[in-house]
């Protein structure tokens, strides 16, 4: 079964809070969102983050591999420009987005494209699972998990000629959801000038 089939099946059969609501990192730091502009939601799923951005007056491009997810998002939020695409073959245009969100989707070769896709002063929200998740979910493919410190190191300002600034970083177990514990690395950064 390929990724698209797996996600289509999952979105057809599972009803989970986490699929339909915005991530806490985004809602807690809504103060960083501009009043207008174009945003990109990578691996948008059922549109929780995309809907939140739209409700804050932003235009939203949402990309997901699942046509089931995209169809559901479009029925709830017709204004979202939703794209069915495999992110392994997706091009992020340079200097286009004021906000990019990337929650629980790890594709390391997209990181530089996300930075380059931001306009000056644009903000990137990233949150991915850590290898620590293997202690409670050994079935997870380690390829899709971050090593300790990996996210912060990958976005070190020196790697991007000083054109980014980390605004917030956290690594560890999320304490707000005890029924579904998650070890995550989360970061908010801004592109400078």
Q: What residue ranges belong to the model's regions?
A:
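Conserved SAM-binding strand-loop segment of SAM-dependent methyltransferases
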Residues: 78-88
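A short acidic, Gly/Pro-enriched loop at the edge of an enzyme's catalytic core
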Residues: 91-99
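Conserved class I S-adenosyl-L-methionine
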Residues: 1-34, 36-45
């Amino acid at each position: 079964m390929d990724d698209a089939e797996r996600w289509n099946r999952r979105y057809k059969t599972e009803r989970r809070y986490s699929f339909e609501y915005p991530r806490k990192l985004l809602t807690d730091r809504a103060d960083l969102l501009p009043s207008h502009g174009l945003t990109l939601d990578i691996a948008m799923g059922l549109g929780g983050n995309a809907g939140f951005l739209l409700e804050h007056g932003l235009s939203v491009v949402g990309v997901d591999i699942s046509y089931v997810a995209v169809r559901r998002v479009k029925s709830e939020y017709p204004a979202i420009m939703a794209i069915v695409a495999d992110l392994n073959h997706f091009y992020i245009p340079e200097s286009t987005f004021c906000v990019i969100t990337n929650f629980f989707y790890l594709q390391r070769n997209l990181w530089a494209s996300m930075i380059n896709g931001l306009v000056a002063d644009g903000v990137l929200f990233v949150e991915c699972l850590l290898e620590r998740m293997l202690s409670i979910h050994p079935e997870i493919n380690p390829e899709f998990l971050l090593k300790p410190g990996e996210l912060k190191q990958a976005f070190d300002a020196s790697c991007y000629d000083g054109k980014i600034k980390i605004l917030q970083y956290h690594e560890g177990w999320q304490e707000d959801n005890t029924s579904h514990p998650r070890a995550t690395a989360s970061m908010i950064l801004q592109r400078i000038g």
